[in-house]
Design a protein with these regions (language model features):
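Conserved beta-strand element within WD40/beta-propeller blades
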Residues: 45-49, 94-98, 144-148
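Conserved long hydrophobic alpha-helices within structured protein cores
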Residues: 16, 54, 95-106
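Loop/turn position at the start of each blade in beta-propeller repeats
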Residues: 30-32, 39, 79, 89, ...
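Blade-loop segments of beta-propeller domains
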Residues: 65-94, 121-122, 128-129
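Per-blade loop-tip surfaces of WD-repeat and WD-like beta-propellers in eukaryotic adaptors/scaffolds
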Residues: 58-70, 102-131, 137-173
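Conserved beta-strand position repeated once per blade in WD40 beta-propeller domains
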Residues: 83, 133, 175-176
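Acidic and/or Ser/Thr-rich intrinsically disordered tails and linkers
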Residues: 1-67
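Loop/turn segments within WD40 beta-propeller blades
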Residues: 37-41, 84-91, 135-141
Length: 176
C-alpha cells in the first residue's frame, strides 16, 4: 500500500459566516495594467464602475456585510480609474490613477466612508495622457511613482506634491 502526503497539509480554511461577502466582483473598464482592487489592514478599495467618471468603493475589512444597492463612494476622477494602491505606511491613505491624467491621494476617515468623498488630500498633475500604474516607495514614507501612457515616469513627494524626478521612458512600462 502506497501512501502519499498532501502538499497542502498545513492549509486551513473556514466557512464564511452568514452575512459575510460570498462573492466580490471587480471590473475595470479601462485598458490598463493597474489594479482594480487593493487592500490595507483596515480597508478594501475596489474600482467601481459608474457613469460619468471613475469611482472607488471603500469597505472596512473588519465589518463585512452584503453591499447595499447604494453606498458612499470616492468620486473624484473625471474618467475611469486605472490603478489603486494603499500606502504601506498609513492604512487609510489611498492613491488612485486615472485616464484623466491625474494621480490623487485620498485620506479615508478611520471609521470608513459615511457619505461620498470628492475632496482629495493631494492632486498630482504632470502626465499629458492617462496614468496607468502607481507604486508607493517600499521604504520611504511619502514617495510615490506613477507611469503614464505617454511613456513618462514621475516620482512625487506626497506631502507637498513636488516632482522629485521625471524620467522619459523608451517604451511603455507594464510594471513599476
Amino acid at each position: 500500500m502506497v501512501s502519499t502526503l498532501s502538499k497542502y497539509k498545513n492549509i486551513f480554511g473556514e466557512q464564511n459566516q452568514k452575512g459575510q461577502f460570498d462573492s466580490v466582483e471587480a471590473r475595470n473598464n479601462s485598458n490598463s495594467d493597474g489594479s482594480s482592487v487593493d487592500v490595507s489592514p483596515d480597508f478594501l478599495a475596489i474600482n467601481w464602475l459608474t457613469k460619468g467618471g471613475g469611482a472607488i468603493g471603500i469597505f472596512e475589512t473588519n465589518n463585512f456585510m452584503r453591499v447595499k444597492s447604494s453606498f458612499p463612494l470616492i468620486r473624484g476622477h473625471s474618467a475611469a480609474v486605472t490603478d489603486l494602491k494603499f500606502s504601506p505606511f498609513v492604512n487609510n491613505l489611498l492613491a488612485s490613477a486615472s485616464e484623466d491624467g491625474t494621480v490623487k491621494i485620498w485620506t479615508i476617515p478611520e471609521n470608513g466612508l459615511k457619505e461620498d468623498m470628492t475632496g482629495e488630500t493631494q492632486l498630482f498633475n504632470g502626465h499629458t495622457k492617462k496614468v496607468s500604474l502607481l507604486a508607493f516607495h517600499p521604504s520611504v514614507r511619502d514617495v510615490i511613482a506613477s507611469v503614464g501612457s505617454a511613456q513618462d515616469l514621475f516620482v512625487w513627494n506626497i506631502t507637498n506634491s513636488e516632482v522629485l524626478s521625471k524620467i522619459n521612458l523608451n517604451e511603455q512600462a507594464y510594471n513599476i
